[in-house]
Regions:
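Glycine-rich beta-strand-centered segment in the early N-terminal region that forms part
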Residues: 21-37, 50-96, 135-137
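Short amphipathic alpha-helix with an adjacent loop that forms part of the alpha/beta core around
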Residues: 217-228
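N-terminal Rossmann-like NAD(P) cofactor-binding module of classical short-chain dehydrogenase/reductase
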Residues: 85, 232-235
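Glycine-rich phosphate-binding loop and adjacent beta-alpha segment
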Residues: 241-303, 337-342
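C-terminal hydrophobic helical "lid"/dimerization subdomain
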Residues: 1-4, 245, 289-342
């Protein structure tokens, strides 16, 4: 295994195969063989050239499940053959954010698969401190711990509790994860999405009500679902500026809006509504180890399942040839996982 295959985004809309030297782990690192990898919205935006924190060329892939094949000389607590998932955020642990426990928004953060090469390749060497043991989980579930952790962080930021009225806008992977986790917290959850296909997915896989925000009676239906009130908490997972600008109109007085979806541009929020309601507005970025640990526990307990978001699987060996058609142009894709043994 002196060389390996890697899938590289050479430039926007140009994904190519390359052969690279297999990395060697530094003393505190572990060499992992990729088993499964999730395809993230970040990867899709990077392919299209509209990911704001990106440079080319780049090996994508930050949602990873892998097997350990070699450990560095200083690594303790992990062994060859162990199955692991990756926490892809490399934080400095020195800045004010890190020192206050917010390693997820480190001032100098580097994300594997975004700011440096990731796991759309056979092997990857990563810090042992960024691994989670996942021997009890199926590989496709373990690969999806990362997007579920982003959802979990947004729910934790909002302090969602038993009985809260929560509206999740956007039934993509992060929105689906947020809805599932908020419901596990005991909240009354409604999901809004303009896609009928995604609303059906919400109903079938999460067992939650799903509304079309474009319907003329959307707000009236929302109030009916929430006993005459608007949402106490709104989690926006769309990254759509129109939806994000309108979010404050869908919360009750004293309500909270959490932006977990990212928009590359400015937003215009109706200040009169924002102030009148004494609204709380917050962003949610990435996740911390606490969120990863919680998702792993929820998966082990059956509270979270891969099929809550996963609806397509791809073979790594043919991904470059089919990426545009099967991923970029697939209107029914919610979440895809790459299988490396196919």
């Amino acid at each position: 295994m002196t060389t390996m295959k890697a899938l590289v985004i050479a430039e926007p809309r140009n994904m190519v195969w390359t052969t690279r030297a297999t990395p060697q782990p530094a003393p505190g690192e572990v060499l992992i063989k990729i088993v499964s990898a999730g395809i993230c919205g970040t990867d899709i935006h990077a392919w299209a050239g509209n990911q704001p924190f990106f440079s080319y060329p780049r090996v994508l892939g930050h949602e990873l499940c892998a097997d350990i094949v070699e450990t560095g000389s200083a690594v303790e607590g992990f062994a060859v053959g162990q199955r692991v998932a990756l926490i892809p955020y490399l934080s400095c642990y020195q800045c004010d954010a890190c020192q206050s426990g917010k390693t997820n928004c480190c001032e100098h953060i580097s994300v594997i698969g975004v700011h440096q090469d990731g796991g759309f390749c056979d092997y990857l060497s990563v810090p042992a401190s960024n691994l989670l043991a996942v021997d009890a989980l199926a590989p496709e579930a373990a690969a999806l711990i990362e997007p579920f952790a982003i959802s979990a962080h947004a729910v934790r930021r909002a302090a969602v509790a038993q009985g809260d009225a929560v509206l999740v806008v956007g039934a993509g992977p992060i929105g689906l994860g947020a809805a599932a986790i908020a419901a596990s917290n005991g909240a009354r959850v409604i999901v809004a999405d303009t896609s009928e296909y995604r609303r059906q997915h919400v109903s079938q896989q999460l067992g939650l009500p799903a509304l079309n925000p474009a319907d003329a009676d959307f707000i009236a239906t929302l109030r009916a679902e929430f006993n005459g009130q608007l949402a106490l908490t709104l989690i926006d997972a769309t990254g759509n500026p129109a939806a994000m600008n309108a979010a404050v109109n869908l919360i009750r007085h004293g309500g909270t809006v959490v932006y977990v979806g990212l928009h590359k541009g400015d937003l215009v929020i109706p200040d009169s509504e924002f102030h009148k309601k004494e609204s709380t507005l917050m962003g949610s970025r990435n996740a911390t180890r606490e969120d990863f640990d919680r998702v792993r526990e929820f998966m082990a307990a059956g509270k979270l399942r891969a099929d809550m978001m996963l609806n397509r699987r791809f073979a790594f060996s043919t991904l470059a040839e089919h990426f545009e058609e099967a991923v970029i142009n697939n209107r029914e894709l919610i979440k895809g996982v790459i299988d490396f043994d196919r």
